[in-house]
Structures are given as C-alpha cells and as structure tokens.
Regions:
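Sec-dependent signal peptide recognition
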Residues: 1-8
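Lipid interaction determinants
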Residues: 16-66, 72-130
Length: 130
C-alpha cells in the first residue's frame, strides 16, 4: 500500500495558480474520506474526515490522534487531543487532489494528497503490557 502512495506522489503535478478552498468546499471534498498525504515524494500521514468537522490523524505509525477542524482567517485549522496548538493550513484543489500549505507560507511544509484509499486507516490501541 505504501508503494502505491509513493508512486502516486511521484507523479503528482503542482497546479499553476489554484484558489484556496473555503471551509464549505473543504468539508464537501473531505467528509467521509480517508486521505493519504505526501511530501517531497514520500508518505507523510493519513487523515480520516468525519461528520461535524471531526478528524483522526496518523503519521502512518499506527498512533492515531482525534481532533477537530475549523476555519480561521481563510485557513483550515486543526486541533488534536494530543496537541492543543492549532495547526493551520490553506488547501487548494489541484488536478490530482488536495495541496496543503502550512500557515499559507510558501517556504513552509507543503503536502500533496496521494489518494482516497476507500478503506480504514490503521490505528493501534493504547500501549499495553507488563
């Protein structure tokens, strides 16, 4: 599965001048989907988008974090149970999926949607043992 993600990331093209998505556009595009994201040709993470702007994020390590998103000053901001500091992004819809720019800063992290896999993401339970 990771190989499929990496192949899709390698062929993702950067759109010319796309317009930032509104909260309504973002919700309409993402709700009910599980999307993989990549950066610089490598898998970065996966997010499941639920009703009422709830999300579940993982860095593909089996550790999943519940959160919510909201719009603030033209950006889509995420707050997770394990991190109360908002993580704000602008999203554009390119020809091959979403493009996310951290804090709308062209020099900051940029992520590309790899695909909607149409299946559940892997989340391990809490650490248990002796």
């Amino acid at each position: 599965m990771i190989l499929r993600v990496l192949i899709l990331l390698a062929i993702t093209a950067h759109p010319a001048l796309a317009q930032n998505m509104s909260a309504e556009d973002f919700d309409r595009y993402t709700r009910g989907k599980t999307l993989f994201y990549g950066q610089n040709g490598a898998a970065y993470g996966v997010e499941r988008y639920l009703d009422r702007r709830r999300v579940v994020w993982s860095f593909l390590d089996g550790q999943c974090n519940d959160g919510v998103w909201y719009e603030d000053n033209g950006q889509i901001c995420f707050v997770y149970d394990n991190n109360p500091d908002p993580q704000c992004w602008t999203f554009q819809q390119g020809p091959n999926g979403l493009i996310a720019q951290f804090e709308n800063d062209p020099t900051a992290t940029e992520l590309y949607e790899a695909e909607d896999i149409g299946e559940e993401m892997l989340c391990y339970g809490p650490d248990v043992g002796v």
